[in-house]
């Protein structure tokens, strides 16, 4: 992509971003990101979070989902969060900065979970997008497979999993894999998710 084309594309993205009603609402409410609204819509539909829960948040920065979940699980709840990027502290959130694909980071995350019974694993992870689906989709699928592996390791029976997935090659196989592990699986496209985006959210409940 030439610099001129990239500049035009970036300008369009910025214009769309700042005119987005959810971005504007997030700024007014002092929220960390518009992702807060996506999780709020999912919670209204699926009632994933309850007071006192332990939750794992993958791809947490800048903290929109953790910020939302804190309001749902209360002071006795606990969030263990991880992201490659830094995140400003949130009371009630134990944050680990590191690459979730790195075995040492995964080990450190599991150590922080310890013997806790995790009721929800949530992942809003996404790779740096190149704009080429043949490159981006496999990278994204690798991340969501790792998130599902985390579910296998830490999620308590009856627990829930919410994960952002980009529709494309590997999506149907991944959905089948999730259905084999959970009793109820739904696909959500929140209103606050941009219509042109390939992203959807798989909401799986009732870990077998």
Curated annotation (Swiss-Prot):
The residue range of the signal peptide is: none
Superkingdom in the source lineage: Bacteria
Q: Name one GO cellular component term.
A: cytoplasm
Q: Which residues bind S-adenosyl-L-methionine?
A: 63, 65, 83, 99, 124
Instruction: Say yes or no: keyword Cytoplasm present.
Output: yes
Per the record, what are the reactions this protein catalyses?
uridine(2552) in 23S rRNA + S-adenosyl-L-methionine = 2'-O-methyluridine(2552) in 23S rRNA + S-adenosyl-L-homocysteine + H(+)
Annotated TM spans? none
User: InterPro entries in the record, alphabetically?
Assistant: RNA_methyltr_RlmE, RNA_MeTrfase_FtsJ_dom, rRNA-MeTfrase_E, rRNA_MeTrfase_gammaproteobac, SAM-dependent_MTases_sf
| Molecular function (Gene Ontology), one example | rRNA (uridine-2'-O-)-methyltransferase activity
Keyword RNA-binding present in the record's keywords: the answer is no
Q: Report the EC number(s), separated by commas if there are several.
A: 2.1.1.166
Q: Where in the cell is it found?
A: Cytoplasm
Active site per the UniProt annotation: 164 (proton acceptor)
Q: Which UniProt keywords apply?
A: Cytoplasm, Methyltransferase, rRNA processing, S-adenosyl-L-methionine, Transferase
Family named by the database record:
Belongs to the class I-like SAM-binding methyltransferase superfamily. RNA methyltransferase RlmE family.
The protein's role, per its UniProt record: Specifically methylates the uridine in position 2552 of 23S rRNA at the 2'-O position of the ribose in the fully assembled 50S ribosomal subunit.
Please give the name of this protein: Ribosomal RNA large subunit methyltransferase E
Organism expressing this protein natively:
Salmonella paratyphi A (strain AKU_12601)
What lineage does the source organism belong to? Bacteria, Pseudomonadati, Pseudomonadota, Gammaproteobacteria, Enterobacterales
Q: Which gene encodes it?
A: rlmE
